[in-house]
Every structure is written in C-alpha cells, then in structure tokens.
Amino acid sequence: MTIVEDAKKGLITEEMKVVAKSEGVTEDFIRRGIAGGHIVIPMTPYRKVKLCGIGSGLRTKVNASIGTSSDIVNVEEELEKARQAELAGADSLMELSTGGDFLDIRRRVCEQSNLSVGSVPLYQAFIEAARNKGGVVFMDEDDLFKITEQQAKLGTNFMAIHTGINYETVKRLKNQGRHGGLVSRGGAFMTAWMLHNEMENPLYRRFDYLVEILKEHEVTLSFGNGMRAGACHDATDRAAIQELLINAELADQAHNAGVQCILEGPGHIPLDEIKTNVQLEKRVTNNKPFYMLGPLVTDIAPGYDDRVAAIGASVSSAAGADFICYVTPAEHLALPTPEEVYEGVMSSRIAAHVGDMVKLPKTREADLEMGHARRDLDWERQYAVSINAEKARCIRNSRMPADSDACTMCGDFCAIKIVQKTFNF
C-alpha cells in the first residue's frame, strides 16, 4: 500500500511520525492531511532521505534546483551545488540536467544527498530524442514512460509531470498570444511535439498508465506548470488557468488511486495577483499542496532575482502556498554557481519564514527570542537564533567595536544601552 492508502485506512506510518515530530503537530494531523490530499511526504523505497512534509498547516518548504546545461557539464560542480543547497537549509532538490550523462548525474546526486530529489522525466526524453533522432519532435512516447520508471528506480522522490498541456491549453495559448512567450522548457518541448505529430500529449492521454508507474514506486506527482507566464504581463491568463483546471481534475484521479500530488504555480506574477492565484489553486484542487516557482514579482532586476523572488515567496507563503522553488541571482543570465545556489536558498528560506509568521503564529517565537537577545545585548544568543549564524558572526567580528557589548553602527551611542540606564526592561 502507498502512504495515501495507509492514511485513508487510519494507519499512522513511521514517516508520518517523523514529520509530525519535526513540525510540532499530532501524528493524526499528518495522517488526516495525507488522506485528504492536503499534505504530502515525498518518499522513495530506494534510498533513505530526510523526510519533510509539504502542505496545509505545515512550515513552508524550500526547493533548490540544480543541474547541467548543454553549454556547461561539470558533474562535480553540480554535486557541490547539492551540498551547498543542503548546507543552506533547503528541504529538497530538483535535478534538472539537460547536458551530459543524465543517468550518471542523477544517480550521483541521489547517492550523495540526504534530501528528497525531484526530476522532470520529459527533459531527458526530449533531449535524448534531439541527440539521437535529430529533434525533440521525434521523441517516442514509450521512451518517455520508460525514462519515468528509470528515474523512479534511481530514488527520485517527486517528479514534475506536464500533464496539463493538451489541445485545449495550446489552443488558448495560440488564440490569446503572449508578451513573454512560452518559457517552460517542458511546456515548449511538449507543445512542439504535439503540433508536429498532430497528437495529444501522451502524459494526458495515457494518464492512467503514468499513475500506475508512480504508484508502484511511491513517487509524488508534481503537476508541472508548462503554461506558466514568463513575464508579469502574462500572469493569470487563459492558458495558465486552463492548465490549472486540467491538472486539478487529474490530481483528484491520482490521489484517488493512491498517489500523492502537488500542483505547481506561477513563476512571474505581479504582487497583487499572488493571493488570488493561491486561493484559486486551493479552491479548485481541494486544498492540495501548492508549489510556487519563485515567484518573480517584477521582470526588470536581472542579477537580483533572488531578492525579487523572495518578495514574491513571502507573499505567496503568507497567502497559503506550501512549497517554494528558490531563484538564484543568476536567473535569466547564466547557470548558477554553488555560491549563488547557497544565496538563493537563504533568500527563499527567509521569505518562507516571513510567510509562515502570518499563517503559522508559532513560528514567531524565534523572532520574539531575537528581540529579547537584542534587548539584552546577548550576541551569542542572537547568533544562535539567526537563520545564518556564521554570516552574522563574521560581519560583526570583521568590524568589532571598542565596547564589546555594542556594534560599530552606533558605538558609544547605542540606543539600547542608553535606555537600559533609564528603564528596567
């Protein structure tokens, strides 16, 4: 039985116990969430991982995407990115290589990492078709399902599957047009294949078979957002909403079959549309976990997109999004370095916490403790509460004040020290 089937029968598994303890909730809260499709625990029978729960009533989780490109294939650097992501506190990885030996890269990432690992089988299927047959449009759909099973057996915990791209979504995209085009690689690959071959998306047409594969290997199904906007001006358009509605219906089918489900959301969206998108997803999917890709709330800040995404992620989390995909400073410019991966994870973790302060009041306890530590000029306590104690300590130690209680921002005129002489806080 899958964990969904166990939960529906009232059984509490070891995985549920682990997540309940880490989240500070009851085991039955987790069980009921999984049974209802509101919570997932990405799993795999093929390797041990650090389990995390994603969904309603739990802390917002952060994913870090890594992987080679056709221009840069450096496996050791990708492994270092995986290490840096874990060091920075990411909850999961997505291995999205589009260059090199896909099997070897993904196997090594899964062997090295303690985190849940996600993948996009469609990438490998289409790129191998381009390498071996002369173009992505010559992909054999049977190969797509074989690759899906192959990746599951490597120990992949969740997969982004582009099921919601069908004739209806493509028609709406074509009729409507866009300012920023189609930016999802999976969406672009599948749309090109459908139009060239005059065939329906096999992931949609053969969805029952896909679910059988994922269920057999206990893989969580993350419904890919192939029609997501690549520019804020295109957000919340007909193609994106059509895809969401299709994926919502398919998610019910998959959950009823015993497969855990997540739905992916926007990547570029104005700030004032975020809450609407989260509420819409939660409504039409019966509160299934929502995975926001960033999101970026302006398109004019290349080089700073980790900060732009952190703004969007904090609002998304506060509105009810459950899972955030990080963005690095290199977004839209280059393949990120390990250092940029680390910074991207940190930015997203801060954003996730900011959102959690709104929807999960108990997460404010750390901020309360920091307030007390600052009031008391207790620097060690401040470091301990910090999201990145090493960086905080390093900055202060590089510019130590004459008075060890204070810092060089205020020096002799530290507001806290002045007030301490007057009030007994």
UniProtKB/Swiss-Prot annotation:
Binding-site list for substrate: 94, 123, 162, 184-186, 225-228, 264, 291
Family classification: Belongs to the ThiC family.
Lineage: superkingdom: Archaea
Cofactor(s) for this UniProt protein: [4Fe-4S] cluster
GO biological process, any: thiamine diphosphate biosynthetic process
Residues reported to bind Zn(2+): 268, 332
One Gene Ontology molecular-function label: 4 iron, 4 sulfur cluster binding
Catalytic reaction list: 5-amino-1-(5-phospho-beta-D-ribosyl)imidazole + S-adenosyl-L-methionine = 4-amino-2-methyl-5-(phosphooxymethyl)pyrimidine + CO + 5'-deoxyadenosine + formate + L-methionine + 3 H(+)
Top-level enzyme category: lyase
Record organism: Methanocorpusculum labreanum (strain ATCC 43576 / DSM 4855 / Z)
Alphabetized UniProt keyword annotations: 4Fe-4S, Iron, Iron-sulfur, Lyase, Metal-binding, S-adenosyl-L-methionine, Thiamine biosynthesis, Zinc
Biological pathway: Cofactor biosynthesis; thiamine diphosphate biosynthesis
Protein name in UniProt: Phosphomethylpyrimidine synthase
Cystine residue pairs: none
Record note on cofactor: Binds 1 [4Fe-4S] cluster per subunit. The cluster is coordinated with 3 cysteines and an exchangeable S-adenosyl-L-methionine.
PANTHER family to which the protein is assigned, alphabetical: PHOSPHOMETHYLPYRIMIDINE SYNTHASE, CHLOROPLASTIC (PTHR30557:SF1), THIAMINE BIOSYNTHESIS PROTEIN THIC (PTHR30557)
Name of the encoding gene: thiC
Primary role: Catalyzes the synthesis of the hydroxymethylpyrimidine phosphate (HMP-P) moiety of thiamine from aminoimidazole ribotide (AIR) in a radical S-adenosyl-L-methionine (SAM)-dependent reaction.
EC numbers: 4.1.99.17
Residues that coordinate or bind [4Fe-4S] cluster: 407, 410, 414
